């Protein structure tokens, strides 16, 4: 049985324990805490990142896992409304490089910059993408705009500068998605919104973006692979 299958088989109880632990974690900023929970995989440790990304979450995460036996696998549990995009990207790339799966538990949130981290999840055995969204979890995207943009009339030169900055943001987003092998369709979720609004996707939609969906009550994990193959065949 694969690491993913064994993990999911044990998640009904593990998810409840993680949820209880999460309820006690501080929300002031993204505090990295290590939850050593028995989920049927004695060589696996769950690490939670919770709260706003304030600027050094990647350091906190690396500091946390530095204390964990290198022989143990790690699962990143995310619960954040967003914050510093640079930190989200850094976490996502590290998750991908270190083959760390990501998960958002039911009743919790991963939005804005947090999605950059979430999309870096990777199967430690196969090396394929592994991002898990539990039923009842919220995953949200929105468009980022250049800083310092008050509502006022702008000159042509200013608008051209804003256009260049926006293109750079989109390009940077694209490069991140390519790095972590995420669906490029995610760009539509970002560019199709205004920066003040968050576009939350359903569990069914998540499968279209290469995200696995977990029913923690039954332990059933719906993988996007076969659905993606059927969709591709339909496009041919």
Pin down the residues of each PLM region:
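Bacterial N-terminal signal peptides that target proteins for export
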Residues: 2-15
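C-terminal segment of classical bacterial N-terminal signal peptides
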Residues: 18-27
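Small-residue-centered hinge/linker elements
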Residues: 28-73, 79-83, 127-185
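Terminal peptide-recognition signature
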Residues: 49, 76, 118, 206
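Short, glycine-/small-residue-enriched flexible loop/hinge segments at domain edges that mediate gating
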Residues: 71-87, 101-109
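Membrane-embedded segments
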Residues: 85-92, 96
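Glycine-rich beta-to-alpha active-site loop
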Residues: 96-146
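Charged, glycine-interspersed solvent-exposed loop segments at helix/strand-loop junctions
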Residues: 142-235
């Amino acid at each position: 049985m694969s690491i993913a299958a064994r993990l999911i088989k044990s998640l009904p109880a593990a998810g409840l324990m993680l949820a209880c632990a999460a309820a006690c974690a501080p929300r002031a900023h993204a505090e990295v805490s290590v939850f050593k929970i028995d989920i049927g995989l004695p060589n696996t440790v769950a690490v939670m990142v919770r709260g706003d990304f304030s600027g050094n979450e990647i350091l906190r995460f690396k500091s946390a896992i530095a204390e964990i036996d290198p022989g143990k696998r790690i699962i990143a549990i995310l619960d954040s409304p967003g914050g510093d995009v640079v930190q989200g990207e850094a976490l996502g790339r590290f998750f991908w490089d270190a083959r760390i799966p990501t998960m958002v538990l039911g009743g919790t949130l991963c939005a804005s910059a947090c999605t950059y981290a979430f999309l870096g999840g990777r199967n430690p055995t196969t090396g394929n993408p592994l991002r898990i969204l539990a039923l009842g979890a919220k995953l949200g995207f929105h468009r980022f705009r250049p800083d310092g943009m008050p509502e006022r009339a702008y000159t042509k030169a200013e608008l051209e500068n804003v256009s260049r900055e926006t293109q750079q943001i989109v390009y940077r987003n694209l490069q991140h998605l390519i790095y972590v092998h995420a669906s490029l369709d995610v760009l539509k979720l970002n560019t199709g919104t205004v920066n003040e609004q968050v576009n939350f996707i359903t569990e069914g939609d998540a499968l279209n973006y290469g995200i696995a969906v977990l029913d923690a009550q039954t332990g059933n994990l719906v993988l996007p692979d076969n659905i993606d193959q059927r969709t591709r065949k339909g496009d041919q």
